[in-house]
Amino acid sequence: MEQRKTQVSSHPFSVESLISSHKTNKDFERRREDVSSQFAQTEIRDSCGSAGIPKHFMLQTSPVKSESPEPDDCTSWVMNSRYSQTRQESPCPLRKHKTNRKPRTPFTTSQLLALERKFRQKQYLSIAERAEFSSSLTLTETQVKIWFQNRRAKAKRLQEAELEKLKLTAKPALHPNFSLPLPLGTQLHSAVSLYGQSYPYQRPLLPVAPVGLYGTPLGYSMYHLA
């Protein structure tokens, strides 16, 4: 009877055998999942460092610098170059005057007219004249002295410019080797008008043969010449 029970229980199509086989399948799948999860954890542990960071990330953050610049360095370089270009392209600063330079004296219209009038009369003032003139204009002697110095320099520049203009307008239009023929009987005033200089005019003399060389009397020769 016991053998029959064992035979019945061991039958492959029995309920107990089916339940036991189902349990074994579940256990096998659970064990396989555990093994696969353990294997994945070991792979991750092998691929990561001590701090749990992947090795490829650790290689990028290694102290050895690669040939290509890092993103942060590239960004900082671009920003620095952009701002440096804007600083270079900024307009050049104005010329700085000396700190100890005195400000320019603002003259009034009446003072300028009086200074110009005095300069036309006399370009150089003596010490007494300068003191008197500056007191009449309520200016200092230094201001009057500096104004006269600047005005003399301006007058010199204007004079040089006028001389250059006269030189340009006075250039001869004809070639320097070209000369106009003058007739023999040209009067003195024509020579003076052309050259601006006066020279004593002399009529050219014709060669005359001596009288003693001819055998005929003087009166006869003069008669025939007439």
From Swiss-Prot:
Chain residues forming the annotated DNA-binding region: 100-159
InterPro entries recorded: HD (IPR001356), HD_metazoa (IPR020479), Homeobox_CS (IPR017970), Homeodomain-like_sf (IPR009057), Msh_Homeobox_Regulators (IPR050674)
Single Gene Ontology BP annotation: regulation of transcription by RNA polymerase II
Molecular function (Gene Ontology), one example: RNA polymerase II transcription regulatory region sequence-specific DNA binding
Region feature Disordered, mapped onto this chain: 1-45, 85-105
Main location: nucleus
Domain of life (superkingdom): Eukaryota
Compositional bias of kind Basic residues: 94-104
Compositional bias annotation for Polar residues: 1-22
GO cellular component terms attached to this protein's record: nucleus
This protein's UniProt keywords: Developmental protein, DNA-binding, Homeobox, Nucleus
Pfam family, one: Homeodomain
Family of this protein: Belongs to the Msh homeobox family.
Entry-linked PANTHER family: HOMEOBOX PROTEIN MSX, HOMEOBOX PROTEIN MSX-2
UniProt name for this protein: Homeobox protein MSH-D
Organism for this UniProt entry: Danio rerio
Gene name tied to this protein: msxd
